[in-house]
Amino acid sequence: MQAFLKTGKLSATDKPSSSGVKSTKKKPPAPWVEKYRPKTIDDIVDQGEVVQVLRECLSGGDLPHLLFYGPPGTGKTSAILAAARQLFGDITRDRVLELNASDERGIQVIRDKVKTFAQLTVSSSRPDGRPCPPYKLVILDEADSMTTAAQAALRRTMERETRTTRFCLICNYVSRIIPPITSRCSKFRFKPLARENVIKRLQEVCEAEGVDVGDGQVLHQAVDTCEGDLRRALTALQCCQRLLGKITADGLIEVTGLVPEKLVNEYLNVKNYSELEKFVEKFLMDAYSASQLLEQLSAVVVTSGHLTNKQKCSISEKLAVCSHRLLDGGAELMQLFDLGCAIIVANNNP
């Protein structure tokens, strides 16, 4: 303090040091799907054929236009991002344009943003002097949601800018991509991940995070709950861990929005209108999803050993009608009552 009053500066001994411990900045928590996203194509789970072809393309430094399709959560986006990192290294951000479902991808965006990026000419070396492919990469995630006009505009850009740009389209349904684009791309189908590989990957992530999953049964439930989607399963496990402090079977049902099996069976076994009215009122008060109930009910009806074929047919027919109405914006209350009445009739007339 004396030194400060005389010179206006703190001396080396006067600097605030708290307890002499260096302050360490804590990293903010990151989503597990990003934190453990594969860094190289060899880290991609259960897509051996795709990885082999990509490895050969990368070894020659040449990449064709690509079309990745398959179920969600199978590694399509991770594969192309890993390939881009291996191709471009430290300049990946400058060489890659990624557009996904959150971006506007109408015809105007294709004509302006994508076309402008594709027309840029790039060098064949990095700032550090290492060789680099002389082209850029445009990644269009969920390309099957693009309009036909936007896809037609993209086709023209793909034709004209092949020398300086490669395109990778990612979609769930290849049938929604126009033929002129599919004919210009090398198509790769990402198959559903094997159950044991998904569980193994979930186990690795949980061990890395220090999360106790007991005998692993909860991981099997996570795979069943998320229908084999590795991304959804990882997100569900992280949500359960962050919200509840531990991963449990009931916690997974809660964070994924599933309807408890007890409620599904209760709805399927209603015998009169009074029971139905009480169930629907409590179901909606608890804020469960009617669409989710109908989806789970469909699987239960088909596999049920207590219902006759006649009962299954009548319930399934009404279930399909009510599901369609919900998709069209119908009221959940009305559809639950309508289907419930059909279930009552079926239960009372086996």
How would you name each of these model-derived features?
Residues 1-183, 187, 319, 323, ...:
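P-loop/Walker A NTP-binding region and its immediately flanking N-terminal helices
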Residues 2-17, 265-350:
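Helix-rich C-terminal "collar"/helical-bundle subdomain used as an assembly and partner-interaction module
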Residues 35, 179, 196, 216, ...:
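Amphipathic alpha-helical repeat elements characteristic of tetratricopeptide repeat
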Residues 135, 201, 212-225, 247-253, ...:
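Short conserved motifs of the RecA-like P-loop NTPase core
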Residues 185, 191-217:
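Conserved small helical "lid"/interfacial subdomain of P-loop NTPases
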Residues 217-225, 231-245, 264-268, 278-282, ...:
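C-terminal helical "lid" of AAA+/P-loop NTPase domains
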